[in-house]
Curated annotation (Swiss-Prot):
Primary localization: cytoplasm
GO terms for biological process, alphabetical: translation
Transmembrane regions listed in the UniProt entry: none
Compartment(s) where it occurs, according to its Swiss-Prot or TrEMBL record: Cytoplasm
GO molecular function terms noted in the UniProt entry: structural constituent of ribosome
GO cellular component: cytosolic small ribosomal subunit
Keywords, sorted A to Z: Acetylation, Cytoplasm, Ribonucleoprotein, Ribosomal protein
Subunit structure: Component of the small ribosomal subunit. Mature ribosomes consist of a small (40S) and a large (60S) subunit. The 40S subunit contains about 33 different proteins and 1 molecule of RNA (18S). The 60S subunit contains about 49 different proteins and 3 molecules of RNA (25S, 5.8S and 5S).
Upper taxonomic lineage: Eukaryota, Fungi, Dikarya, Ascomycota, Saccharomycotina
Gene name of the encoded protein: RPS1B
Protein name as annotated: Small ribosomal subunit protein eS1B
Organism (species): Clavispora lusitaniae (strain ATCC 42720) (Yeast)
PROSITE patterns assigned: RIBOSOMAL_S3AE (PS01191)
Short name of one Pfam family: Ribosomal_S3Ae
Family that this chain belongs to: Belongs to the eukaryotic ribosomal protein eS1 family.
Length: 256
């Protein structure tokens, strides 16, 4: 009989299960902090594998983009149809300091705006902010019925639409190029630019449902930690940001 290893004896018992390893044991949680431009600064939490050896968790978190409903950031359901993108620029302990990365509309809101018997006007422009962020801004508007109009439809002539589109581009360039990214965010929340377009185009065409429907970040300047900390209020521990006002006050009539 040949002397050798008995394969039957070396085998383990059948039916034994491997010890279950919790995948979350190797991960750690981080708090996502929105800029102080928004009212609610606590966006949520995210996780990543713990730092091991040369692999640093902070490197994997920088550049992450989160999409958040503006209603959650502002604490108001009036903004539920708009989504804000926030990008992680710096990691401080367990806090992720984010910056504005873009804005978009929900698809159901956009579909609800498009109706029969009216003309759609769209315009977009690529513009640089005062702090060297290159953005592409998209605007949308619809024609509306004039006072005492009998006609059912509100279709506009193409020449009028070209005039309106030109005016929209001019206003967007002016409103974006003269402000920083943080100041622009404060304008986008109460839709100041949309109201400015409505006021300026009143003599050409009466418009309704005027919105900045999308803001896309194309290029950003060299990272500056000081400006990011200033955007987050230095300490970045406060849960509440500054309330953005629309700049319009309700007029109360003394007598009817």
């Amino acid at each position: 009989m040949a002397v050798g290893k008995n394969k039957r004896l070396s085998k383990g018992k059948k039916g034994l299960k491997k010890k279950a390893v919790d995948p979350f044991a190797r991960k750690e949680w981080f708090d996502i902090k929105a800029p102080s431009t928004f009212e609610n600064r606590n966006v949520g939490k995210t996780l990543i594998n713990k730092s091991t050896g040369l692999k640093n968790a902070a490197d994997g978190l920088k550049g992450r983009v989160f999409e958040v409903c503006l209603a959650d950031l502002q604490g108001s359901e009036d903004h539920s149809y708009r989504k804000v993108k926030l990008r992680v620029d710096e990691v401080q302990g367990k806090n992720l300091l984010t910056n504005f990365h873009g804005l978009d509309f929900t698809s159901d809101k956009l579909r609800s705006l498009v109706r029969k018997w009216q003309s759609l006007v769209e315009a977009n422009v690529t513009v640089k902010t005062a702090d060297d962020y290159v953005l592409r801004v998209f605007a949308i508007a619809f024609t509306k019925r004039q006072a005492n109009q009998v006609k059912k439809t509100t279709y506009a002539q193409s020449s009028k639409l070209r005039e309106v589109r030109k005016k929209m581009i001019e206003i967007m360039q002016r409103e974006v190029s003269n402000v920083t990214l943080a100041q622009l965010t404060s304008k986008l929340i109460p839709e100041v630019i949309g109201r400015e377009i409505e006021k300026s185009t009143q003599s050409i065409l009466p418009l309704q449902n005027i919105h900045i429907r999308k803001v896309k970040l194309l290029k950003q300047p060299k990272f500056d930690l000081g400006s990011l900390l200033a955007l987050h209020g230095e300490g970045s521990t406060e849960e509440k940001g500054k309330k953005v006002s629309s700049g319009y006050k309700d007029v109360v009539l003394e007598s009817v």
